[in-house]
Curated annotation (Swiss-Prot):
Protein name, per record: CinA-like protein
NCBIfam families (UniProt xref): PncC_domain
Family (UniProt): Belongs to the CinA family.
SUPFAM superfamilies xref list: CinA-like (SSF142433), Molybdenum cofactor biosynthesis proteins (SSF53218)
InterPro entries: CinA (IPR050101), CinA-like_C (IPR036653), CinA_C (IPR008136), Competence-induced_CinA (IPR008135), MoaB/Mog-like_dom_sf (IPR036425), MoaB/Mog_dom (IPR001453)
Lineage of the organism: Bacteria, Pseudomonadati, Spirochaetota, Spirochaetia, Leptospirales
Length: 417
């Protein structure tokens, strides 16, 4: 059974443009990976009448077809949080406090001191849910999520709008419930990443020529990221999926990868190798990404942010003449940066990044987006790669740090870097 899926994000900060709705896109992508397609995404202000009108329309639609509505926001403690109130009006139910959540909230606020303890009665509303609903525990925050029936095989899911709370609740609490509510046939999913290639080029080069051969019974989707695209293929035919992946690997042998971030983490742990970084234009982004997973302290030894030429010379021992002759953004300086880094840290792997992130600083010879990435491997070999990344400052920095991780991935895979 496939429901008609609608995502609703509530919050006047969203409709006023003060905040960006990241929840809807994230939920839609998660649902696609589970084999479901979203039909509509709606953004609403904190207006109980507008919210009620949309929910009432979905309740009416649920009389004809299965509907799954997923709503985020409006479960907080303030007077502009209308989700529970609106759902109670829609269903004609009363609410009750989830005792476990109420006890947890009490402990948290009492620990914060008298001022917080005094406002407990007003914040208890976050623990209230409709009678008879399925509750969704909040392991990160306070507000309790819930699943309310909209009719036969139709449901309204309400979750907090805080992204960290919503994502954890979705993955740990909601997904198991969705699989019970809407059992799927044995859908198989395969995912690959392709580097330095855009969505449109991928569709033109791979999807269109193979549409009649591969994609009559296989769903596909692409998520664009900085430096790579994430390609997802879904089918009940595992043989067809394997054929598609083999064809993909044949066409893009040097650009294809699995989840780079996870593989680098797991492989560095497995091999007991260490790594250090020296960054200029990326300002620590690579170090941040290498340390996002628990356990990274086993392999990440540290790094340097050598933004100025003086720091490059003083910390890494790069001759000033080298910088003056070739420029701070050059193959020669990227080589010297990673060489000096590994002399200091003694790590198995070393990575250097130097570039022009813009918007100023570019030239005809080295335009904005020029980035040099140096990689030292455990065998002592150093190779420098030069790129010209598109986009604004943020995009160039993200492209550079992600591509550096891809180079580490390729080296760990034993590919020629």
């Amino acid at each position: 059974m496939t429901p008609y899926i609608v995502i609703l994000s509530t919050g006047s900060e969203l409709t006023a443009g003060r905040s960006v709705d990241t929840n809807s896109g994230w939920i839609a992508n998660q649902l696609f990976e589970l084999g479901w397609k979203v039909k509509k995404i709606i953004t609403l202000p904190d207006d109980p009448n507008l919210i009620f009108k949309e929910l009432e329309a979905l309740q009416s639609l649920a009389k004809e077809i299965p509907v799954l509505a997923i709503m985020t926001g409006g479960l907080g403690p303030t007077e502009d949080d209308y989700t529970l109130e609106t759902v109670l009006k829609l269903t004609g139910k009363t609410s009750y406090a989830v005792e476990k959540a109420k006890i947890r909230l009490t402990k948290i606020y009492e620990a914060r001191g008298k001022d917080y303890k005094d406002i407990l009665p007003t914040v208890f509303r976050q623990t209230n849910v409709p009678e008879g609903c399925k509750t969704l525990d909040n392991s990160v925050g306070i507000a309790v999520g819930f699943i309310e029936s909209l009719g036969e095989n139709s449901y309204l899911v309400c979750m907090p709008g805080v992204p960290s709370e919503m994502t954890e609740m979705f993955k740990r609490r909601l997904v198991p419930e969705l699989k019970k509510m809407y059992p799927r046939e044995n859908l198989i999913q395969k995912t690959k990443w392709l580097w330095n290639i855009g969505e449109s080029l991928f569709q033109n080069e791979f999807i269109e020529p193979n549409r009649e051969v591969y994609f009559k019974e296989t769903e596909w989707g692409v998520t664009a990221n900085r430096g790579y695209i994430k390609c997802i293929f879904q089918s009940t035919n595992d043989v067809m999926l394997d054929t598609i992946l083999k064809s993909l690997e044949k066409q893009y042998p040097d650009l294809i990868s699995d989840d780079v971030f996870q593989y680098v983490h797991e492989q560095l742990l497995y091999e007991k190798w260490t790594i250090s970084v020296v960054e200029s234009c990326t300002g620590g982004l690579l170090g941040k990404k290498l340390t996002e997973r628990a356990g990274s302290s086993a392999y990440f030894m540290g790094g340097f942010l050598t933004y100025s030429n003086e720091m490059k010379s003083n910390l890494l021992g790069i001759p000033k003449e080298t910088i003056e002759t070739f420029g701070a953004v050059s193959d020669e300086v990227a080589f010297a940066m990673v060489d000096g880094l590994c002399l200091k840290t003694g790590t198995d792997f070393g990575v250097s990044i130097t570039g022009i992130a813009g918007p100023e600083g570019g030239s005809e010879e080295k335009p904005v987006g020029t980035v040099c990435i140096g990689l030292k491997e455990p065998n002592g070999k150093i190779k420098v790669h030069r790129y010209l990344f598109p986009g604004n400052r943020e995009s160039i920095r993200e492209n550079a740090s992600n591509t550096a991780l891809f180079l580490i991935y390729q080296s760990l895979k034993g590919k020629v870097v």
